[in-house]
Regions:
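Non-transmembrane functional regions of envelope-associated proteins
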Residues: 1-211
Length: 211
């Protein structure tokens, strides 16, 4: 009887072990279908050659403003910058960059810093019981000049136990039960001029998010 009890007690530990969790993730991977590019989104990387051409990094905000204008002239209906701008530009280009961010729906990134500060909560409607989701320990916001003229979203990509990224949260919660939108969620919100998130929950957590 003692052996049977011991085996039963060990089963949850085995099921939650790292090798077992990795196996579960690999099985999950087999069910994920490869998605073909839609052609609606384009990723533009800043390369080492770009940095060399500009004489170093970070680029002056006036240069970023020109890039923003160039993208718009090439047909972009929205621009997302996966770069944060918490400090003022020593070259004095924040005003012109902020102006160009307002030409089309735009989003700039925020990143976690663990210092317990958070952006002002946005409009959120929760249908169902409260759930916490992924909790952030602090976010570094962007410069007021920029964030007041565009949207900012949290760039976060937590890894699984095998150090691969499979899931990117749409919203992240704070210890005081507010919600921080992710970068991708803000892109959608900007393009469709949405003001409020509707979060539907169930016993398992967040069921769906409507924007």
């Amino acid at each position: 009887k003692k052996k049977k009890i011991l085996i039963i007690l060990l089963l949850p530990l085995i099921y939650q072990s790292v090798p077992t969790e990795i196996l579960k993730l690999k099985i999950f991977d087999t069910f994920v279908k490869k998605q073909e590019p839609s052609g609606n989104f384009v990723i533009l990387n800043i390369t080492e050659q770009d940095v060399e051409n500009e004489g170093g990094y970070p680029f002056p905000r006036k240069t970023l403003a020109q890039i923003q204008v160039d993208l718009i002239n090439e047909g972009a209906i929205g621009v997302g910058w996966v770069i944060s701008f918490p400090q003022a530009d020593r070259m004095g280009g924040d005003e012109v960059f902020a102006q160009t961010l307002g030409y089309v729906p735009s989003v700039i990134a925020m990143f976690e810093d663990g210092k317990g500060n958070y952006p002002k909560p946005t409009g959120t409607v929760v249908k169902g019981s409260h759930v916490s989701g992924i909790v952030s320990m602090g976010v570094k916001e962007n410069l007021n000049t920029l964030k007041d003229n565009t949207l900012q979203g949290l760039a976060i990509a937590p890894t699984e136990v095998d150090q691969l990224v499979r899931r990117i949260p749409l919203l992240v919660s704070t210890p005081n039960n507010n919600w921080i939108p992710s970068f991708g969620t803000q892109i959608y919100k900007a393009l469709f001029s949405v003001k409020t998130y509707i979060i539907k929950t169930n016993d398992n957590g967040i069921e769906e998010i409507s924007i």
